Amino acid sequence: KDFLKLSSASAMLFGLKSHGINFSYLERPYDYSKNNSQYMGDFAAPKINVVKVAFIGVGARGSGHAKQIAAIEGTEVVAISDLYNDLAMKSYEACKKIGNGNRHKNIAIYSGGENKWKVMLNEVKPDAVFISTNWDNHAPMAIETMKSGAHAFVEVPMATTIEDLWEIVNTSEKTRKHCMMMENVNYGRDELMYLNMCRKGIIGDFLHAEAAYIHELRFQMNEEKRGTGSWRTHHYAKSRGNLYPTHGLGPVAQYMNLCRGDDNFNSLVSFSSPALGRKLYAEKNYDSEHKWNKLNYSNGDMNTSIIKTNLGRTITVSYTHLRAHETRP
């Protein structure tokens, strides 16, 4: 916790000053954690023989989670919440089919309103909740989930502000509930194979790593009817830097055994290129009065961050949400 209070704030300050943003508030002393509670890093929740699972958000991402969890023995899908009833029903039918009449028999549906998920938490009382919504809702939904008595599993990123991250930590400690960010790349077969090689000493001394999140995502600007992806566009106007570092950085941190006693992140510098790609895409594909042509895109087309660890090892983390070619229509 002391590491989070000191080094994470200083690393953000050191790296993000390169963007000309005022982060002086990070330099002020602040009692982030007020619980004086037990550290949750080594906490093991009591075993649950049949885990009652609920889902908030079952669009392109959440629907996949619903099917995967429903297929695991020892789970019982008890509720699904989404803004749109047809999406909720699609996952409902998929889970029922996977249950084959033996499991997932009583799935409650909560749809049609932005706060139906709160009603779900209050009425169903699940053991675990999987959250796959837009970024801004991740933290408040995770916090309310833990307060309701359930463990929270949250899509990337877990939160978008330092204050929300600390509220998640405090709530987890107070409620004794897990809150896990579902950084799936940490658990990919290729990544786990390489991690195993690192731990067996096959790779040798690990001195430098390069990680990246490189996608063409401008096509999501077209998903306006239901906002399934277009909500990202606003973040490119209000945020700067690497908005999605953990896909690449998570596995690398494991390879280097960071945050586990041997070594840790020490300092960071971060620079972004000018932001031109989304502006040009908007001008080409939408009329001049369209909302996408009214945004001041500030998130650079390419961000490069360099991290140095306590032992002097280095990591380069690259990020872009556009490519020279489009990978989807």
Task: Give the positions of each predicted feature.
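Short helix/strand-capping hinge loops at secondary-structure junctions
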Residues: G149, E155-P157
